[in-house]
């Protein structure tokens, strides 16, 4: 009965996800018109006391007091809203409909789309070498970034963490200044979205726009015009809808930018910029593995491609110390000379030769390869569809997405540490007769990245919404198994990857238990 209930819960959750899910594409058009307007059951009015991630305190960056609502300047700001509303266009109505579902959700959608657009490995030069994208010259060929899974996981984490800290500061200053919402000052004012009882200064949407734009400009520098366009829409929506006056917006943008600067400074020194390594390092990794008597991994791309970010395991985590990463490292994989390895290789070959329609659907659904928002993005999409049904406040949205994405970044760090520590070959390297059913990633096999990401995500989401734990765990297992069914991973890769993800996810859960939000 328990297994049947778990199966039903999983299927229900998957159907819900598929009903809302739109795939990413190069036209930056991932949108979801079926989401309702944000109308939280609880505004979390005391969230200004929640534990920040990087800020030393919610008031680390000062915010000037607002102008009084009795001043002529404030009256002019009220009149600006009325002027917009008296001449509202269909385009402006569409902007309100789009952004009123919530800023955290919409920026997450936008980021997933940007990740998908830039998830393109560089094409080789005429001499067979591969150029590397450079943040110093992002418009060159190849464009920066190549948003592969580790890069994407880090990007989601930085943006989500910065948004969360920014909204904690916002809630703090709302409480400090207690400026009433415009409709409470002028009862003739229309409000075109659900009314909020929260103070209006500073605007939470403006803070989100301010902090997110600065992070996305760093992470996706060729997309600045589009990113700024979306931020301008978000600011305009709050004014036209009657939710905020101009000074609420201006203060929010200023505060968001200040907070972004602290995260940008951290990003500059977290080690991600040197994670690609160099030719000497790549050769050393192969030599070290061979010295143990094991078969070292090699790139199966033609021409041979440099390994993907072999030093990403050294990137600075938000929740784990380097010692914790090493302590969490999984046990060694089966020796390439062992009977267990031979059995697991044979199992992969059998799946390759006897692919069922059901297995192929599973492989395809969880592939998340080139041109997609990556496995971390897939779990962001799953979380978003479920969070919409929970009627969270904007700040609780930010908190939950931050917990998820911090764990996914740590999953990338821990998984890449294991991959390049063990340098284990792919099944089709050991047996070239194996035909893979999905793309072959350009990095070692052990442990599976999909499995680690999925284990971490399911652990965090199960804590956030315990009633859906069985469904989240079932999805993680299916995502993990899909890599073995696709003939690119051994069973040990998948099973140990899930376990590593669970360990990593629990570090985020431990933080959740003491962050003041529960």
PLM regions with names:
Residues 20-23:
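C-terminal motif of bacterial Sec signal peptides marking the signal peptidase cleavage site
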Residues 25-518:
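Acidic/polar surface patches and capping/hinge elements
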Residues 2-13:
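Bacterial N-terminal signal peptides that target proteins for export
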Residues 1-2, 25:
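N-terminal hydrophobic targeting signals that begin at the initiator methionine
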């Amino acid at each position: 009965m328990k297994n049947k209930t778990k199966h039903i819960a999983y299927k229900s959750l998957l159907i819900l996800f598929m009903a809302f899910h739109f795939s990413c594409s190069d036209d930056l058009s991932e949108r979801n018109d079926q989401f309702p307007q944000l109308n939280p059951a609880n505004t979390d009015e005391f969230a200004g006391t929640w534990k920040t991630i990087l800020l030393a305190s919610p008031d680390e960056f000062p915010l000037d007091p607002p102008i009084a609502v009795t001043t002529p300047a404030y009256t002019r700001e009220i009149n600006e809203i009325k002027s917009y509303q008296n001449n509202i266009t269909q385009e402006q109505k569409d902007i309100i409909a789009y952004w009123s579902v919530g800023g955290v959700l919409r920026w997450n959608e936008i980021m997933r789309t940007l990740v998908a657009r830039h998830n393109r490995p560089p094409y080789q030069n005429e001499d067979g070498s591969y150029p590397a994208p450079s943040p110093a010259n992002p418009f060159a060929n190849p464009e920066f970034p190549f948003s592969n899974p580790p890069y994407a996981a880090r990007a989601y984490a930085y943006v989500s963490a910065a948004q969360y800290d920014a909204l904690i500061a916002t809630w703090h200053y709302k409480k400090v200044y207690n400026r009433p919402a415009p409709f409470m000052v002028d009862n003739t004012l229309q409000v075109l979205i659900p009314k909020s009882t929260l103070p209006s200064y500073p605007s939470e949407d403006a803070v989100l726009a301010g902090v997110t734009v600065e992070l996305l400009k760093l992470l996706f520098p060729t997309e600045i015009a589009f990113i700024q366009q979306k931020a301008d829409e978000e600011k305009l929506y709050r004014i036209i809808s009657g939710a905020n006056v101009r000074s609420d917006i201006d203060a929010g943008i200023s505060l968001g930018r200040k907070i972004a600067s602290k995260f940008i400074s951290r990003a500059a020194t977290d080690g991600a910029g040197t994670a690609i390594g160099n030719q000497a390092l790549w050769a050393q990794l192969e030599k070290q593995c061979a010295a143990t008597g094991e078969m070292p991994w090699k790139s199966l791309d033609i021409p041979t491609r440099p390994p993907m970010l072999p030093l990403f395991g050294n990137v600075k985590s938000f929740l784990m110390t380097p010692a914790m990463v090493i302590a969490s490292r999984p046990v060694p994989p089966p020796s390439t000379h062992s009977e267990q390895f031979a059995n697991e290789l044979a199992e992969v070959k059998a799946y390759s030769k006897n692919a069922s329609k059901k297995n192929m659907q599973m492989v395809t659904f969880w592939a998340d390869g080139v041109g997609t928002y990556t496995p971390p993005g897939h779990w962001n999409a799953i979380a978003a569809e479920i969070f919409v049904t929970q009627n969270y406040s904007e700040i609780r949205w930010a908190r939950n997405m931050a917990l998820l994405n911090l764990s996914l970044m740590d999953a990338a760090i821990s998984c890449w540490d294991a991959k390049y520590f063990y340098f284990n070959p792919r099944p089709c390297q050991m047996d070239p007769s194996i035909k893979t059913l999905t793309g072959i990633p350009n990095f070692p096999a052990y442990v599976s990245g999909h499995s680690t990401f999925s284990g971490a995500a399911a652990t965090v989401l199960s804590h956030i919404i315990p009633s859906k734990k069985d469904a989240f765990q079932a999805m993680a297992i299916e995502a993990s198994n899909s890599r073995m069914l696709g003939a690119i991973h051994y069973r040990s890769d998948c099973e140990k990857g899930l376990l590593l993800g669970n360990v990593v996810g629990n570090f985020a859960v431990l933080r959740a238990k003491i962050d003041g939000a529960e």
